[in-house]
Regions:
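Composition-driven recognition of glycine/serine/threonine/acidic- and proline-rich low-complexity segments
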Residues: 1-222
Length: 222
C-alpha cells in the first residue's frame, strides 16, 4: 500500500501519493497537478484501435520514481470527493468517468455496456474492471456515499461511481420511453447480491440540463 493523503475534501479533493523508488503509479490522463522532479512520466494506451473506435479504450499516465521516493499530486476534473479501496486479490468495477489512479499489482480491463437498442442505440456505460492486490482511487461529482447491497437496490446510472465484487446488476429503462423523453428519467441499474455501491450526489447530465435552460437563444426574424 502506498502512502497517500486526500486534501481539500469533499468539494475539491486533491490526492497526493508517495511513490517508493522504482515503483509505478498509474493515473487518469491529464489529471496530474504536480510531481517531484525525479518522477518519470509516460503515456499509456489500453485497448487498441478497435476498442478506441468503440470507446472501450483507456488513456492513462504512468509515473515511476527514479533514484528515490517521489510524490504525485492528482486533481480530477469534477468538483467532488475522492474515494480509496485497498484490494487484496479482489475486484472492483469503476465508472470510466470516475477513475483516478491505481498501483502496481492491480490489472485493469475495459467494458462497454450498451444501454439500449433503438431510440438510444449507441449509448452506453463504460466500466473499468480492476483486479488484484493494491490501491485504487476514484472520484465523485459532488459528495461520495457508500451503500450496502444486501438484497436489491435500484440506482440511477448517472449516480454510480463504483461497486465491489459480489454484486450483480441489470440495466433497465425506467418507466418506458415517455419517462425518458418527458420526465428526464432514463436508465437505472438494479443491483443484487452482497457488496457495496459507491454513488455521487450529483450527475453531469443534470448540470447540463439545468444550464441549458439559461442558454442564450437567438430570436428568428421574419
Amino acid at each position: 500500500m502506498m502512502s497517500f493523503d486526500i486534501k481539500c475534501r469533499p468539494e475539491f479533493a486533491l490526492l497526493t501519493v508517495e511513490v517508493p523508488e522504482g515503483k509505478k503509479l498509474f493515473v487518469e490522463a491529464s489529471a496530474m497537478a504536480w510531481m517531484s522532479a525525479n518522477m518519470k512520466m509516460r503515456a499509456l494506451f489500453k485497448g487498441g484501435l478497435r476498442r478506441f473506435i468503440s470507446k472501450e479504450s483507456l488513456f492513462i499516465s504512468e509515473f515511476e520514481a527514479q533514484g528515490f521516493a517521489g510524490e504525485v499530486a492528482i486533481a480530477p476534473g469534477p468538483s467532488g470527493d475522492i474515494g480509496h479501496l485497498s484490494l487484496n486479490n479482489q475486484t472492483v468495477y469503476i465508472s470510466s468517468s470516475s477513475y483516478v489512479a491505481h498501483t502496481e499489482g492491480v490489472s485493469y480491463e475495459t467494458k462497454f455496456q450498451r444501454l439500449s437498442q433503438g431510440l438510444l442505440s449507441g449509448a452506453g456505460w463504460f466500466l473499468i474492471k480492476m483486479v488484484g492486490t493494491g490501491d485504487v482511487w476514484f472520484n465523485s461529482y459532488g459528495a461520495l456515499e457508500s451503500l450496502d447491497v444486501s438484497d436489491n437496490l435500484t440506482i440511477d446510472n448517472g449516480h454510480i461511481v463504483a461497486f465491489t465484487e459480489g454484486v450483480e446488476y441489470d440495466i433497465v429503462r425506467l418507466g418506458g420511453y415517455k419517462s425518458l423523453l418527458f420526465s428526464g428519467e432514463g436508465f437505472v441499474c438494479k443491483f443484487r447480491g452482497q457488496g457495496k455501491v459507491f454513488i455521487q450526489t450529483k450527475k453531469p447530465a443534470s448540470l447540463i440540463s439545468w444550464a441549458n435552460a439559461y442558454r442564450p437563444v437567438k430570436s428568428s426574424r421574419a
